From Swiss-Prot:
Cytoplasmic side, ranges: 49-56, 120-138, 219-235, 292-312
Entry protein name: Olfactory receptor 2L8
CDD domains to which the protein is assigned, alphabetical: 7tmA_OR2T-like
Annotated membrane topology: Multi-pass membrane protein
Pfam families for this protein: 7tm_4
Organism of provenance: Homo sapiens (Human)
Record-annotated membrane-spanning stretches: 25-48, 57-78, 100-119, 139-157, 195-218, 236-258, 272-291
Segments on the Extracellular face: 1-24, 79-99, 158-194, 259-271
Compartment(s): Cell membrane
Matches recorded under SUPFAM superfamilies: Family A G protein-coupled receptor-like
């Protein structure tokens, strides 16, 4: 493998786990999760599009989250499945750059979008009379396009860097996708300045939004506590707890992975943590948002009845 790495520009993805007897089990499990994520997120997007009761800022943002998750998991899992089926773990230099770009762009966009969703709930509960003004269609579009553009600019900057640094060591990336920190460890130049920019990016895309989300929900919980309506209080708590669950699943492993000093990082640990925000979160998000949401379940019933009536 060492000779291959020195004469080829391709990278080698070592995968999630070393080869073992239970490879087939992991393959089936990951493909199953991928299909669940595909069905769940597509269903959420179509449901919000087809049911007029869900044409609100909250669900408009949720449909974008599902779109991001759909693309997010599709950037990584199909390549993993292909590697297992064909036994070829190589990925071209350009292919690695493309995968890295989409991973960073979608990851950054999702982090910012989750902050926008927290702001939406903050305005809806703390300033209900101003909700339609502060969360107009124009504001929602600006939030969404801003998330995509900022995430893409950040991704472009990091991808251009990793594609231009010299790789004179083994080209075997100890990961299951082209993760920038894992790629940088293969460089034959000092990258401490760049690692500082990674820390800065992680702070901008993870720490600042998380602080904003925490402050928003601190205000929300205070407002909910003083609500007179028990039903309104229950609904608000349910909505907030759902979003906080999603935020925790996404931010916690990301923050722990990217904000740790290099000396404390472990490739095995990084790969396991990456499973949470690249594979599990896209599958769990539509389930979490729909399982206890009466509006989503009601919309599902209405759309199903409409489809059945058309067939009859």
């Amino acid at each position: 493998m060492e000779n291959y790495n020195q004469t080829s520009t391709d990278f080698i993805l070592l995968g999630l786990f070393p080869p073992s007897r239970i490879d087939l089990f992991f393959f089936i499990l990951i493909v199953f999760i991928f299909l669940m994520a595909l069905i769940g997120n597509l269903s959420m997007i179509l449901l919000i599009f087809l049911d007029t009761h869900l044409h609100t800022p909250m669900y408009f943002l949720l449909s974008q989250l599902s779109l991001i998750d759909l693309n997010y998991i599709s950037t990584i899992v199909p390549k993993m499945a292909s590697d297992f089926l064909h036994g070829n773990k190589s990925i071209s230099f350009t292919g690695c750059g493309i995968q890295s770009f989409f991973f960073l762009a979608l990851g950054g966009a999702e982090a910012l979008l989750l902050a926008s969703m927290a702001y939406d709930r903050y305005i809806a509960i703390c300033f209900p009379l101003h909700y339609l003004i502060r969360m107009s269609k124009r504001v929602c579009v600006l939030m969404i396009t801003g998330s995509w553009i900022i995430g893409s600019i950040n991704a472009c900057a990091h991808t251009v860097y990793v594609l231009h640094i010299p790789y004179c060591r083994s080209r075997a990336i100890n990961h299951f996708f082209c993760d920038v920190p894992a790629m940088v460890t293969l460089a034959c130049m000092d990258t401490w300045v760049y690692e500082g920019t990674v820390f800065l990016s992680a702070t901008i895309f993870l720490v600042f939004p998380f602080i904003g989300i925490s402050c928003s929900y601190g205000q929300v919980l205070f407002a909910v506590y003083h609500m007179k309506s028990a039903e309104g209080r229950k609904k608000a708590y349910l909505t907030c707890s759902t979003h906080l669950t999603v935020v925790t699943f996404y931010y916690a492993p990301f923050v722990y992975t990217y904000l740790r000093p290099r000396s404390l990082r472990s490739p095995t640990e990084d790969k396991v943590l990456a499973v949470f925000y690249t594979i599990l979160t896209p599958m769990l998000n539509p389930i979490i948002y729909s399982l206890r949401n009466k509006e989503v379940m009601g919309a599902l019933t209405r759309v199903s009845q409409r489809i059945c009536s058309v067939k009859m």
